Amino acid sequence: MRLSPVLLAALVLYAVPLAAQRFSLVVPASALATQVTGRAFLFIARTDKPEPRLQGGAQRRSEPFFGADVESLASGASIVIDGNTPGFPLASLARLPAGEYFVQGLLLPYTRFARADGHTVWAHMDQWEGQRFNDAPGSLVSAVQKIRVDANTNVSLQLATVLPPVQRPADTEWVQRFTIRSKLVSAFWNHDMPLGAVVLLPKGYAANSTRRYPVVYTVGHFSQRAPFGFTFEGCTTPETPEARAVRLARSAREPGCEFQQAWTSGKTPEFIAVFIQHPTPFYDDSYVLNSANNGPYGDAITRELIPEIDRRYRTIASSHARVLTGGSTGGWDVLALQIHYPDVFGGAWSLYPDQVDFRNYQFGNIYTDSNAFVMHDRSWLPREIPSSRTPEGMTELTMREENQAEATIASKGRSGGQWDGWQAAWAPVGADGYPKPLWDKRTGAIDRSVAESMRAKGYDLRDHLERNWKTVGPKLVGKLHTAVGDMDNYFLNLGVYRLETFLESTKEPGKGPYYAGSFAYGRPLKPHGWQPWSNQELLRIMAAQVARNAPRQ
């Protein structure tokens, strides 16, 4: 195609990087009582709806944002964001084309933790928002300004507004919420650390004062919503046939209103349903096991939170009457709880779980690969490793891009992003007290000693099962159930295939006992989020298992 001189000149002008822009984020005395250590951000967007700060993050549609550490910042001081400040999806502010934009500044404060392991670290103490770096209570933000950015831009943004605390929903006759101070995790962090629960009560719970109920524990990314999406909100508008067809093509999971109507009318088996809340200073989910960086969350959940639920509610306090389900992060969590605490739970239904075999750490093999960003199996044609894809197979984000985003959000593995979350949960502690990097976020070079430490600690669930099946296997018969789509957006089906291969091998002579669980695969083109049953159907499956495993009178 031939370009006219005018069009060619316009394209050249648009592509000229801007090298001299400077943004100053200023903290007025009225907004800051003490010095603060944390992370400062500049957000730039083409629209102000929503606010620019809510348009930046580790996702493929992110608007440009830039981040810098601040230490002992005093009121009245300025934080400079310029062409040397790292960013995403633009690596530098200097690469931003000239034009009109909406801009906003933010300062995320960190908390100092003098941990029991002797390390002192700074990280964001979750405020029950779920480690949302751009929307955390206590953060200082500026007003949104519309400006023209060019080579001479020099803008000052006043960080004069403090984001308010999270408003926790009120209890109802159906849904209750509570938190406890975990003695175990608080001792590790030398700081008060909460565990929480959102409890959904069955129909007739208040009227049947002597009846006890089995418990289904749901686990996953931090939320204040009720288990299984139970809600009364928006239920006056029925699902259209077209919307239902689209939903069922993706997953059998029903809308929250439909589940609520079945639950409140007594059409589901009678369980107490509990969603577990366990954010850490590194991620919105602890990954439910004891961790060198996060602390003893596995013991805290099983020895503190579950006994508290048994104390507060009329549960059947027996392992056969405790079942688990969750998807994605929660899918990994429920398998990990069932496998590592087999005497506490009576079955896990894992949906599209995070990597259950680290030979597919999403896509790559952290035990044998040298780089997390690039495949070098063709020396003259190195290829970028995808991190996410469409159900049709088109790459959405690469590993390099996602890690660039996390490195923009925070240094030292504190981004609250997915890769940093896994690293905090499973990696050893580094010499500086922060999680030891599994790979270099700039180059992608893998540290295999970290990978081997993760394997040795039992976080590679398939490997842990294979090494310990003779002792743990008898306690897991009939208790492991996994479902995933064949085109999971994050390649999580690959690890599930490997897990099934091992578990099915337990039927071979000398390898038993046979695991006697199940695997289900969504085909064709089923994405992340696919499940083969509605939540109502899943509860019926769980109720049948609870009844089968109940002690005989």
Question: What do the PLM-derived regions correspond to, one by one?
Answer:
Residues M1-L7:
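Bacterial N-terminal signal peptides that target proteins for export
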Residues Q21-V27, A33-F41, D192-V198:
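Contiguous beta-strand segments within globular domains
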Residues A15-P17:
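N-terminal signal peptide c-region/cleavage motif recognized by signal peptidases
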Residues A45-Q553:
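Non-catalytic cap/lid and distal C-terminal segments of serine-dependent acyl enzymes
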